Amino acid sequence: MAQYLSTLLLLLATLAVALAWSPKEEDRIIPGGIYNADLNDEWVQRALHFAISEYNKATKDDYYRRPLRVLRARQQTVGGVNYFFDVEVGRTICTKSQPNLDTCAFHEQPELQKKQLCSFEIYEVPWENRRSLVKSRCQES
């Protein structure tokens, strides 16, 4: 009986250690699954910059827009990488013809800010140096 209890306690201790060391459910990366992207990651930053650049090319506004804040960033590894961004963008005081648009200040007057909530989907195949904007949807916020 004592040997049975010892074996049972050893199994329970092993299980407890395994569960403590296993990653949390939200940290697990499932192949093909969508998970939160690290905004400090260089590839994520490149994808976001690409989305904003394509967005600015498509707008008829003379003024450059850039992210006010990123609400959510996710990614999915498939035959490349899908990036999904939910971003609040704002209108800057810089026209699109000016250099170094990333440092442009935002309009301070509310009627000129023209904030928008945008969702972008980017598909990238890094080893082929290929990137495309799959979806782009924006609405006034």
Swiss-Prot record:
GO terms for cellular component: cytoplasm; extracellular space; vesicle. Keywords: Disulfide bond, Protease inhibitor, Secreted, Signal, Thiol protease inhibitor. Disulfide bonds join 94-104, 118-138. The keyword Disulfide bond applies. GO terms for molecular function: cysteine-type endopeptidase inhibitor activity. Residues 1-20 form the signal peptide. Human saliva appears to contain several cysteine proteinase inhibitors that are immunologically related to cystatin S but that differ in their specificity due to amino acid sequence differences. Cystatin SN, with a pI of 7.5, is a much better inhibitor of papain and dipeptidyl peptidase I than is cystatin S, although both inhibit ficin equally well. This is Cystatin-SN. The gene is CST1.
